Amino acid sequence: LPLFAEYIQHGYYPFSKDTTFEIELNQVINQTMENDIPQYANMNVSTGRKLKQLLMIIAKSVPFKPVMQKLADIIGVSRNYLSDYLLYIEKAGMIAQVRDDTGGIRGLGKVEKIYLDNTNLIYALGRENSNIGNMRETFFYNQMRVKQDVISSKISDFQIGERTFEIGGKNKGQQQIAKAQEGYIVKDDIETGYGNIIPLWNFGMNY
């Protein structure tokens, strides 16, 4: 568990053991938002700055439940472009969008929540908002979406196929998954699982 806590803060990136890790991570963020994405998407400099502003707004309120028009007004862009901007930021590995199961024209459901891509980014960008609940959900989604189709759950945190997952601490109860067809409680701060209870750290071992 101490090693897991260490990973949460600075274990995701290959340069995590560097003494200048925080400086390097912030350089990666700035390079990605201000140069890489604008060049890839053929954006001008001012639009690149708006992307950075958008990321900071998300970082301060994760898990972020987007109201697209309000968000577009804040950063001064057309609502029509906002979904594309978010998709660029997601593809660049800065955020992760959790969608519902409604599908749509692009084959993507409605975005229900936006997380930072991994827990290290929470410490780099939103340290003052690094609440433990958000940390747990971010880690679970970061690890499971690699090989699974993870969507938002109507009764809990996440849905993978017929399985429902509620994320919490060691005292988390079963109430929210009581009506789930196949429900699991994912608990932080425990080393071993039992019944339908699975330790959070276990999800870091699935690929």
Report residues per predicted region.
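Structural signal for conserved beta-strand scaffold positions within catalytic alpha/beta enzyme cores
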Residues: Q97, L116, E166, I185-K187
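Short, basic/low-complexity N-terminal boundary segments at the transition from targeting/disordered tails
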Residues: N131-R145, T164, I185, N196-P199, ...
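Short secondary-structure boundary/capping segments
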Residues: A5, I105-R106, Q175
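Accessory nucleic acid-recognition modules appended to NTPase machines
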Residues: Y12-S152
